Amino acid sequence: MEMLLDLEVQLLKFLLAKRKLEPKFALMGPDLSGMLEDCDGALLIGDRALEGAKHHPELVQLDLGQDWLQFTQKPMVFGVFATRRDTPIAEVKKAHSVLVENLLRFENEPEQREKVIQWALSRSHLTHERLDRYFGEVFNRIDSNHLSGLNEFLTQACQLPNGAEFAW
């Protein structure tokens, strides 16, 4: 199931449908000016969304995560650790362990957090201050409330009747 870029598109379509809006969608490059030359609206994600909001705050009409929260009273989960079903469970557990270990280092060791921010700075147009704030806004764990939000998204917006399935 490919959802990396499609997640936001699926979420936008779902939220617009709840408002009885059914616009035509066109796949375009992430150039805000170019997108708005040809279309009435544009969906930007990630760094480009943050940059677009910074430079053109008057154009921001909808924050997908905030709208989902207002609509469902549940947080939106924008990223998960996923593997193929045929991946050996021992390898999945090993990878999960490394991810959790890195998260703990990021949360508890200021120098590790700074390394991550510096890495992100080298790949983004965002400022150190904005990246530091961003990493403080992102929740990197899934609790029961987030799982409930994820399952509602998967069942309602993606029509996956079973919701999230876990290896263990």
Predicted feature residues:
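Secondary-structure end/capping motifs
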Residues: 88-156
